[in-house]
From Swiss-Prot:
Gene3D superfamilies: 2.40.50.100, Chloramphenicol acetyltransferase-like domain, E3-binding domain. This is Dihydrolipoyllysine-residue succinyltransferase component of 2-oxoglutarate dehydrogenase complex. The modification N6-lipoyllysine is found at residue 43. The gene is sucB. Belongs to the 2-oxoacid dehydrogenase family.
Length: 399
């Protein structure tokens, strides 16, 4: 019996997707719940699994094709796996010349290899037919990073892609995520009256508190490490309560005030920057916030974030400081009306009670939609965050 292989049902926020990778070819056997094809959307990569044991009979949508929700991708002949197995027996005889061919990399694996300057033929593929999977590329990248500094010779054996002095250009299509990010950035710039206000915060109190309790915190909370982001999320939640307009959104001619704080935290992934959301952050402890962010980071690296985890949010925090950014003007993520930018902690001479003191300082930037948020609200929001972070006991005392 023929079974239709269909694209997943997309949520309303996703119009279509792209066939990223077929893991099976026509004539190849599959088992029930085995991965057949990846569909890339502007938010996540969705996996299509086999509904039954059988053989891939036909591929209707090729890699790179655009597909709609529930659209036919191919056909699976149920129960044909047993008869298809003998046909694969002659393959070893023809395998010899295949060794000379360039390895096949999945899109995610190719991106990781390029970003880490790893030659494709140096990665051992564990996928079907020797295909290099994302996990293979990640393992190769980790192996390269952990290689002893005194043994750089193996990495140098890869031949350069282009001769020195060549004026080389390379044209590649945008990923759906990058295209969607570009679209939303242009939309934000053109549809909002966006402004950015700045302040700076003395990070010494938070750093001292973290240094004092980080070991006990990790032991008490089953290995969850105490970072800086949880303090910023806590401070942002309190500041949003005091300035509800910063937590609101515009819907047509209406202002929607949200009685909850869903905080989006920007996380870097192989596909680009993604923003999973901490739901009801106002009820979360420091440990729950850190644990949630850590879990998001792992899922982002593995490409396992779900659409639900990246949908919604009433306010976003972006930390360019992890990349060394000293100052920036983050762009608001519609339909939200504000975003907080964290930056690098850097020691600077500061005047304190008439004395010059070296303090670890961080610039904070709040970009906001001036159609809804007045300058007074934006400045007050940042001042509240500054006050709470410079006296973190207030976060616990709710004062």
């Amino acid at each position: 019996m023929a079974i239709d292989i269909k694209a997943p049902t997309f949520p309303e926020s996703i119009a279509d997707g792209t066939v990223a990778t077929w893991h099976k070819k026509p004539g190849e056997p599959v088992k029930r719940d085995e991965l057949i094809v990846d569909i890339e959307t502007d938010k996540v990569v969705m996996e299509v699994l086999a509904e039954a044991d059988g053989v891939i009979a036909e591929i209707v949508k090729n890699e790179g094709d655009t597909v709609l929700s529930g659209e036919l991708l191919g056909k699976l002949t149920e129960g044909g796996a047993a008869t298809a197995a003998p046909a694969a027996a002659p393959a070893p005889a023809a395998a010899a010349p295949a060794a000379a061919e360039a390895p096949i990399l999945s899109p995610a694996a190719r991106k990781i290899a390029e970003e880490n300057a790893i030659a494709a033929d140096s990665i051992t593929g564990t996928g079907k037919g020797g295909r290099v999977t994302k996990e293979d590329a990640v393992a190769a990248a980790e192996a390269k990073k952990s290689a002893p500094a005194g043994q750089p010779a193996p990495a140098a054996t890869a031949a350069p892609l282009f001769a020195a002095g060549d004026r080389v250009e390379k044209r590649v299509p945008m990923t759906r995520l990058r295209a969607k990010v570009a679209e939303r950035l242009v939309e934000a710039q053109s549809s909002m009256a966006m402004l950015t206000t700045f302040n700076e915060v003395n990070m010494k109190p938070v750093m001292e508190l973290r240094a004092k309790y980080k070991d006990l915190f990790e032991k008490t909370h089953n290995g969850v490490r105490l970072g800086f982001m949880s303090f910023f999320v806590k401070a942002a939640v309190e500041a949003l309560k005091r300035q509800p307009g910063v937590n609101a959104s515009i819907d047509g001619n209406d202002i929607v005030y949200h009685g909850y704080q869903d905080i989006g935290v920007a996380v870097s992934s192989d596909r680009g920057l993604v923003v999973p959301v901490l739901r009801n952050a106002e009820f979360m402890s420091l440990a729950e916030i850190e644990g949630g962010i850590n879990e998001f980071g792992k899922k982002a690296k593995a490409g396992k974030l779900t659409i639900e985890e990246m949908t919604g949010g009433t306010f976003t925090i972006s930390n360019g400081g992890v990349f060394g950014s000293l100052l920036s003007t983050p762009i608001v993520n519609p339909p939200q009306t504000a975003i907080l930018g964290m930056h690098k902690i850097q020691e600077r001479p500061m005047a304190v009670n008439g004395q010059v003191v070296i303090l670890p300082m961080m610039y904070l930037a709040l970009s906001y939609d001036h159609r809804l948020i007045d300058g007074k609200e934006a400045v007050t929001f940042l001042v509240t965050m500054k006050d709470l972070l410079e006296d973190p006991a207030r976060l616990l005392l709710d004062v």
